[in-house]
Amino acid sequence: MTGAACQKNADCPFITNFNLFTNTVSDIYRIFAKRKLPYEALVGLNLINMTKKLSLLAIILWATLSLQARKWTPAEVRDVIRKVNTYWQQNNKAEVRSFWDNAAYHTGNMEVYKLLKDEQMLDYSIRWAEHNQWMGATEADPAKWKYKRYGEGQDYVLFGDWQICFQTYIDLYVLLGDESKIKRAMEVMGYEADSKANDYWWWADALYMVMPVMTKMYRLTDDEKYLDKLYENLLYSDSIMLDQETGLYFRDGKYVYPKLKSANSKKDFWARGDGWVLAGLAKVLQDMPESYIRQPFFVHKFTRMARAVAKCQQPQGYWTRSMLDPNHAPGPETSGTAFFCYGLLWGVNHGRLDRKEFAPVIERAWKYLTETALQKSGKVGYVQPIGERAIPGQTVDANSEANFGVGAFLLAACEYERYLRKK
C-alpha cells in the first residue's frame, strides 16, 4: 500500500505504528517517549535483528539520518542547474526543429538565463530560434492552416505543438529587441485571437504549449483580446477534459472516466498531462494582470488543482504516471513530477499557495528530483518517453531522458532557488 491510498487507510501499519518515517526528528523522539512504537512492533518492521547489534540511540540516529532532508543553499541549487543544463547543451545540438518537445526545453533554458545571466546558455536558444527562422510551422496561406487533430506537417500552423516556440521567441525579443523575432508570432496568434473558433486546445498538453503564449502576447500588445481568447479556449478545454470532481484534467476526451479506466478501474489522470496544465496556469498567472476581469477564475483553477495534485504524491516524492492508480504503471517519473514541483513552487513564491501547507510536498519532490532523477553526469533520468498516457509495463529508468524532461527540471530548479531565497 502506497501514497494517497495508504494515507487514507486507518489500518495501514506504516501510518498507525511507524509515523516516524514521515515526521520530523522531534516527532521521532516524541513517539518513542510515549511508547507509540512498542518493541514487539519492530518484528513486523524487520528491525528486530538490528536491535541485537545496535542500541536504541543508534536506531534513532539511523532513522533520523535517513529522514532528514538535505538543507540546500541557493548557490548549491544554481550549481545543479548549471550541471544539468551544461550536460544537455554539450550533448545535444541547438539546431533542431521548433516542434513542442524542443521548444519545451527552451522554456526551461530561458528561465535559467533569467536566473544565471549566462550568455552561453542564452546563445543556445538564439541559435535554435535562428535555425527555425523564428517560426513554428511555416505554411504561409491561412486558408491551409490546421489544428483539429495531431499533425507535424508545416500546415499545422494553429496546432499548439507548433506554437509553444513563440514563448521563447517573445522572451528573446523582450531581451534583445528586433521585431523580426516576433513577426510570425504576431501573425499566427493574432489570427487565432481574432477567429470565432474556440476548439483549439483539445488535449491537455496544449494548455502549457499555448496558454502562456496568449499572456505573453498581451504583454507585448496590451490588447485584452488575447486574454479573452485564452479564457474562451480554456472553457472549451474544460468542457471536454476537466474532471469537475477533482479539478484534474484527463489527457483528452478519449480518456474521460468511465469511458476509459485505469488498470484498477480508477480515473486515469496522466501525470505529465496534468503537469503541463499546472505549469501552464502558473505561467499564465505570472503575466496576467490582477485587473483582468477573469483573473480570479484562473487563480481558483490553479489553487484547486494544486491541492488535488498534492494529494496524489507518493511518499518517495514523485507522482506515478497514472496519478490515482500507482499500480497501473508503478515507479518514478520525472517530467510530471518536475512540472508539478515547478507549479507548486511558483504558487508559494507568488503568494498563491500557503508555504506551510505545501512545503512538505515540495521538499519531497525536490529530494526525488535531485537524489533519484538526477544522475552523477548531469543527465536527468526517469522521464517517460513521448506519449499521451500511462502505459503498463513501459520501461522508465535512469537512462530515460528527454528534452522536455530537462526543461521541466530546470523550471523547477530555478523556482526552488527563488524559494530558498525567500525563506
What are these regions (language model features)?
Residues M1-C6, P13-N17, F21-T24, I28-W72:
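Bacterial Sec-dependent N-terminal signal peptides
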Residues W72-A103, E111-G160, F166, L172-L175, ...:
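CBM-like carbohydrate-recognition segments
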Residues Q89, K93, K117, Q133-T138, ...:
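Helix-capping and short linker residues that terminate individual alpha-solenoid repeat units
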Residues E179-P212:
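Asp-box/WD-like beta-propeller blade repeats and closely related beta-sheet repeat scaffolds
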Residues A204, T215-M323, P330-C341, L353, ...:
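Extended ligand-binding clefts on enzyme/binding-domain cores
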